[in-house]
Design a protein with these regions (language model features):
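ABC transporter nucleotide-binding domains
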Residues: 2-5, 9-212
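A generic structural signal for secondary-structure junctions
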Residues: 77, 103, 142, 216, ...
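Generic beta-strand hydrophobic packing signal
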Residues: 5-7, 253, 288
Length: 311
């Protein structure tokens, strides 16, 4: 359903995307994982025919982005990370407006809009003003909009961004239901663990390069038995993280949600030198524990030593 071959986007000497080879089969729910600026949005915009690559090829539903962009636009539902709404419209009016933009026949617009609301469990809000919706409800409305023309492929850029924990759970459940309806879904996120439960395949991207791609369980299996240590200190964690980067026992160090994650070097099983280093340099260590293997630790392990921006 989606395939990219040597897909590259440059701005001057800067590679926003570099030699991306990616393939999604029909029915895949594919998680595109990476921090902000990794190349996720660039990839999605190219697949949506909104951005031309510097070189390389991409196909969606068998159509080339170069020769058949109209066919691709008919086949996809694209939801950007930020989208606008019309403040003075009711929810049902908003969807009928976009149904008209999709050139859906007038007699069908209300039925199609009602169907989309039902798919995203938003029917109860059909007569509410768009401005009255919560952030989570607004995200659902955006998803309902891209479902109006019954696309085969969904390209969703950070659909859970800014949502509270409950809304994130509801969004994950919604994406899983859409996959069960036969949709092929590419969903990007910089929050690594939230995709583990719903995606059958994931790709890890950083600095425009795809570093790992495969079944979730296969990626997790690659890092089982490799310890990742989580540490917390008093005060900002970044200075302590910089100290740990100098430890020969540390193969990779990152900071996430106020916590320091350290991938131990090959053959290292004892994390005590990490604590000793922090204490010696005056950092007040409050906790240290070995992390369970999940997508977050898989990301740290699979990218260690590979994350330097090319000069």
């Amino acid at each position: 359903m989606i395939e990219t071959i040597d897909l590259t986007k440059k701005y001057g000497d800067f590679f926003a995307l570099e030699s991306l080879d990616l393939k999604l089969e029909q029915g895949d729910l594919f998680g595109f994982i990476g921090p902000n600026g990794a190349g996720k949005t660039t990839t999605i915009r190219i697949l949506s025919t909104l951005l031309a690559p510097t070189w390389g090829e991409a196909y969606v539903c068998g159509h080339s982005i170069y020769t058949h962009p109209r066919e691709i636009r008919r086949a996809i539902g694209y939801m950007p990370d930020i989208f606008g709404v019309y403040d003075d419209m009711r929810v049902i009016e908003y969807l009928e407006f976009f149904a008209a933009a999709y050139r859906i026949d007038g007699a069908e617009r209300r039925r199609v809009a009602e169907r989309s609301l039902e798919l995203v469990d938003l029917t109860v809000k059909r007569d509410e003003l768009v401005t009255s919706l919560s952030r989570g409800m607004t995200q659902r409305l955006g998803l309902a909009r891209v479902l109006l023309h019954d696309p085969q492929v969904l390209l969703l850029d950070e659909p859970a961004s800014g949502l509270d924990p409950r809304a994130r759970i509801e969004m994950r459940g919604l994406l899983k239901r859409l996959q069960e309806l036969g949709k092929t879904i590419l969903v990007s996120s910089h929050i690594l663990p939230e995709l583990a439960d719903i995606c059958n395949r994931v790709g890890i991207i950083e600095y425009g390069r795809l570093l790992a791609c495969g079944d979730v369980q296969d990626l997790l299996a690659q890092v089982r038995g490799r310890p990742v240590i989580r540490l917390r200190v008093v005060g900002p964690p970044e200075p302590a993280a910089r100290s740990l980067e100098k430890c020969q026992e540390a193969a990779g160090v990152t900071v996430r949600d106020g916590e320091i994650l350290v991938a131990l070097a090959d053959g290292v099983t004892d994390p005590s030198p990490l604590a000793a280093r922090l204490i010696a340099e005056g950092h007040a260590l409050t906790s240290m524990r070995e992390s369970e293997v999940n997508l977050e630790t898989a990301f740290l392990e699979l990218t260690r030593g590979k994350l330097g921006r090319p000069s």
